[in-house]
């Protein structure tokens, strides 16, 4: 019976004790209680945990991630100078998204089979776009309504570019992910017209983008701070964004070699970053 309980859990870590109870029950054996099942799993080192959420990465993209990481593994502060890191993120005003649980051995949080695949952006109260470089925190722009290629082009033209020229001059490289609105022909024409150099970027690679940890920094700075409406929430986000010191940026950029090595070691699967 114990062997069947462990097998059922390892076949699908998302199975609950009730699911396992149903799958191992047979006419010739007593039905184990849910409490007994949980105890057997804990003794075997399979504890209930919330799964880390990471993007589902295809084989093709895993190979591209490893190749990119190898190409940039030796890059240091000099190579990453004048690079602009950008992304969008949502911030919930009330509570969090749905909670899911899995059972996994201790120390296996980032193993692929114990991750929860995600799709970027679900719903949310406030959506923002932001960027930064090695020398300056960039603007934080609120996105109202649907973020499409036209809204994105407007952000590039009227928010990103003026800041970049004022802080980085005319020689800089822009990073963006491969979201369809970022790579649309409409936006590609803008980059060509403005002669913007783009950093080649592997798909499904938020763990290689240090701005992802900047969003986490924002969350930490606003932990426990309540907002009564979306306008107030954005005002809080913007104030917290402007208060982030450059030491945080420097620490994130110094992590790039480790991020690249982690991707290589994970064979392209999502990493802890």
UniProtKB/Swiss-Prot annotation:
Keyword terms: DNA integration, DNA recombination, DNA-binding, Nucleus, Transposable element
Annotated GO CC locations: nucleus
Main location as per UniProt: nucleus
Any GO MF annotation of the entry: DNA binding
Organism, as annotated: Caenorhabditis briggsae
Function of the protein: Probably essential for transposable element Tcb1 transposition. The insertion of Tcb1 is the main cause of spontaneous mutations.
Signal peptide, first to last residue: none
Entry keyword annotation includes Nucleus: yes
InterPro entries, per the entry: RNaseH_sf (IPR036397), Tc1-like_DDE_dom (IPR038717), Transposase_5 (IPR052338), Transposase_Tc1-like (IPR002492)
Cellular localization per UniProt: Nucleus
Family membership noted in the UniProt record: Belongs to the transposase 5 family.
UniProt name for this protein: Transposable element Tcb1 transposase
This protein's record includes keyword Transmembrane: no
GO biological process: DNA integration; DNA transposition
Gene3D superfamilies from the UniProt entry: Ribonuclease H-like superfamily/Ribonuclease H
């Amino acid at each position: 019976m114990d062997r069947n309980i462990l097998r059922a859990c390892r076949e699908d870590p998302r199975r609950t004790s009730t699911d396992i109870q149903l799958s191992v029950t047979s006419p010739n054996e007593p039905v184990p209680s849910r409490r007994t099942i949980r105890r057997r799993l804990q003794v075997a080192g399979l504890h209930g945990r919330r799964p880390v959420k990471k993007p589902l990465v295809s084989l093709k993209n895993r190979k591209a991630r490893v190749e990119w990481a190898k190409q940039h593994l030796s890059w240091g502060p000099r190579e990453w100078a004048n690079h602009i890191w950008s992304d969008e993120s949502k911030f919930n005003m009330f509570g969090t998204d749905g909670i899911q649980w899995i059972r996994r051995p201790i120390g296996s949080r980032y193993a692929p089979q114990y991750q929860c695949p995600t799709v970027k952006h679900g719903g949310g109260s406030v959506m923002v776009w932001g960027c930064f470089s090695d020398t300056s925190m960039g603007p934080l722009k609120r996105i109202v309504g649907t973020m499409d290629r036209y809204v994105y082009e407007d952000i590039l033209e009227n928010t990103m570019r003026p800041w970049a020229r004022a802080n980085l001059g005319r020689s800089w490289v822009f990073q963006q992910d491969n979201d369809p609105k970022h790579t649309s022909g409409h936006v590609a024409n803008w980059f060509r017209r403005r002669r913007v150099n783009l950093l080649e970027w592997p798909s499904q690679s938020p763990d290689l983008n240090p701005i992802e940890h900047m969003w986490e920094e924002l969350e930490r700075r606003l932990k426990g701070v309540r907002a009564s409406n979306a306008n107030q929430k954005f005002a809080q986000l913007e104030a917290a964004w402007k208060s982030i010191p450059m030491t945080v940026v420097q620490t994130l950029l110094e992590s790039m070699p480790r991020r690249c090595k982690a991707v290589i070691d994970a064979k392209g699967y999502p990493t802890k970053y």
